[in-house]
């Protein structure tokens, strides 16, 4: 039946069983008998339903220039290794700079020399200052230095990279809490954003990553990368329908390719059409 075809299509895009069933149930309740038999009409109804589900979590990050007496905004970026976290920071730094904001970067992923070098090369290319220390140094002290420096220079926004914490390493999770404690000594309101960077291809595993990081440090937003190619990231629907703690965690940006311009604000309509295009009924 048409409904079964749609169900299969949703599962193919990594929406996950539980969320797929909820979507199909809602679709059945909404659609009249005629629509249920008509694949094109059903498809249209599905598209509207999916967009609605995502609209609640689509919230791009708006950063205002700093008021004269205000402290810099401090954004932490967290996530496991290999999700494109450092690249995301570089792209966001450029985006903010293009909006006329002054930006500073902190190379807090002190475990990987490559991460520090990568951030420094972004800094050179975009003419943005980068605070770094030797590999293996304490990332909390990098963050502390960076916040001090950002406050002294009066920048608008400081973007802090952190180690790619593997889920099993509880000491790395403790370290996240430590970085937060240290930064609060300089500004009680900091960090103003804690953004988890997720790889769009990990499917349902993304939910456990969100849960885990959110327990260590309350998340304020997600960036979902690697949505080019085969990863369909239907998992966003599962994220959109789950509350972590008391809130749903907004999707700030999505990464659809390697280019600097490929970090985009998350727009549900465009995302849903792209997702369904691959499954379009003939």
Where is each model-derived feature located?
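Primarily NTPase-proximal linker/entry elements flanking Walker-type ATP/GTP-binding cores
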Residues: 1-108, 115-160
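Acidic active-site catalytic centers that drive phospho-/nucleotidyl reactions
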Residues: 14, 109, 161, 199, ...
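Short beta-strand segments
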Residues: 78-79, 161, 197, 255
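Short acidic/polar alpha-helix capping motifs at helix-coil junctions
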Residues: 82, 110, 172-176
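Conserved catalytic-core segment of NTP-binding enzymes
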Residues: 116-119, 135-153, 167-277
């Amino acid at each position: 039946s048409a409904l079964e075809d749609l169900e299969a299509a949703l599962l193919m895009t990594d929406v996950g069983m539980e969320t797929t069933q909820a979507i199909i149930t809602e679709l059945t309740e909404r659609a009249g008998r005629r629509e249920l038999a008509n694949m094109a009409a059903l498809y249209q109804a599905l598209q509207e339903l999916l967009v609605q589900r995502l609209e609640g979590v689509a919230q791009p990050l708006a950063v205002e220039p700093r008021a004269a007496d205000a402290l810099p905004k401090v954004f932490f970026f967290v996530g496991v290794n290999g999700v494109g976290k450092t690249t995301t920071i570089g792209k966001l730094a450029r985006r903010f700079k293009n909006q006329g904001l002054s930006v500073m970067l902190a190379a807090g992923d002190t475990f990987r020399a490559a991460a520090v070098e990568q951030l420094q090369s972004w800094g050179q290319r975009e003419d943005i200052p980068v605070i770094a220390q030797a590999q293996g140094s304490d990332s909390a002290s990098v963050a502390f230095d960076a916040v001090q420096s950002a406050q002294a220079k009066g920048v608008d926004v400081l973007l802090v990279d952190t180690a790619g914490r593997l889920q099993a390493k509880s000491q790395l999770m403790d370290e996240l809490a430590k970085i937060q404690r240290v930064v609060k000594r300089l500004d009680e309101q900091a960090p103003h954003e804690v953004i988890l960077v997720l790889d769009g291809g990990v499917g349902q595993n993304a939910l456990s990553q969100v849960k885990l990081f959110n327990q260590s440090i309350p998340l304020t937003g997600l960036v979902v990368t690697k949505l080019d190619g085969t990863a369909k990231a239907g998992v966003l629907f599962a994220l959109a329908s789950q509350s972590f703690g008391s809130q749903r965690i907004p999707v700030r940006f999505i990464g659809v390719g390697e280019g600097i311009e490929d970090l985009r604000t998350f727009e549900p309509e465009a995302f849903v059409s792209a997702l369904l295009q691959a499954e379009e009924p003939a």
